Amino acid sequence: MSKLNPYFGEYGGMYVPQILMPALKQLETAFIEAQQDEAFQKEFTDLLKNYAGRPTALTLTRNLSPNPLAKIYLKREDLLHGGAHKTNQVLGQALLAKRMGKKEIIAETGAGQHGVATALACALLDLKCKVYMGAKDVERQSPNVFRMKLMGAEVIPVTSGSATLKDACNEAMRDWSASYDKAHYLLGTAAGPHPFPTIVREFQRMIGAETKQQILEREGRLPDAVIACVGGGSNAIGMFADFIDEEEVALIGVEPAGKGIDTPMHGAPLKHGKTGIFFGMKAPLMQDSEGQIEESYSVSAGLDFPSVGPQHAHLAATGRATYESATDDEALETFQLLARSEGIIPALESAHALAYAVKLAKAATKETLLVVNLSGRGDKDIFTVADILEKQQADSSTTEESGNE
């Protein structure tokens, strides 16, 4: 049986302890067989349609675009059960785990959306669920932590390192090394050791496939660009996959610039990283001059990751996709703008992609069609944003008062 290519150009691979190689090979074989199994595909499709709520809508914004020449469409993954695109591939991997006879699921989460999606899939399919989450993220994503626990998941706060997503990934991988005979590691993004980047892409590619069909029905042509935020990169690769061969469609990923690319406070390895080995793969990585992993930063927990999926690295290297960035301030501004102009509250992650789309729309000099993957809803972020805005208001009042003295 033909095996999948573990590399995308020079990126990817299986850089894991020898003890995990049998588990990864078992997973690859199970995935290849499942892709060819009509019963598996039927069950997956049925869950996506009747449980998760696919296909999701493609919404033309009425007031968001600052330019009459540019139309901005939103692919509404925020409407999916669970509140984000994460549900798609989690259902696929959970079904794979059952197919392999696993009884437990181990997962990592940043914003909590992958954790919530994993918890709901485990509840549905009667699997034990353990979720590793950086202690900082536990603090800033308390609604999602409660959701996970409500659905029966055990949430384990990780206090090592920066206490964020990369540390949760390391702990989850460590746990899996000791329990892979009974547990499946349900990785949450299109990164990590082969075959995860390929599996996650294939279980997310319906995002772009639906978008292509919907935009052709609505506009009679393909979009000029599809735009998605990039942390590890699963929502973006799900959107890009069906457009990669459509050369006239620009693929634009938006990384978190945090406090600015020229500061240490960002999470943009494609713009500012060097190739290294991390999390079982060869990929661009934020590292210092001695090769130590730098701490990534973003206002959005789900983008706070020091590396990126290997297929994105390859798309960037070949020039097929371009990767831009948006700062915390730009994302916060667009988070509020979408809420006020369209009555839709986006996830802070998605707001990074929206911020760049608005910038592109403003600069359009001819009729332009843009599609943004609205990867998740913003319920989980409202308290974070409220705190930031309150602090900004207080700082501004203090400045005004000192100016009047």
From Swiss-Prot:
This protein's record includes keyword Amino-acid biosynthesis: yes
Recorded metabolic or biological pathway in which this protein acts: Amino-acid biosynthesis; L-tryptophan biosynthesis; L-tryptophan from chorismate: step 5/5
Keyword tags: Amino-acid biosynthesis, Aromatic amino acid biosynthesis, Lyase, Pyridoxal phosphate, Tryptophan biosynthesis
Reaction(s) catalysed (UniProt annotation): (1S,2R)-1-C-(indol-3-yl)glycerol 3-phosphate + L-serine = D-glyceraldehyde 3-phosphate + L-tryptophan + H2O
Subunit composition and interactions: Tetramer of two alpha and two beta chains.
Alphabetical list of PANTHER family matching this protein: TRYPTOPHAN SYNTHASE, TRYPTOPHAN SYNTHASE-RELATED
HAMAP family: Trp_synth_beta
Entry protein name: Tryptophan synthase beta chain
Organism of provenance: Shewanella piezotolerans (strain WP3 / JCM 13877)
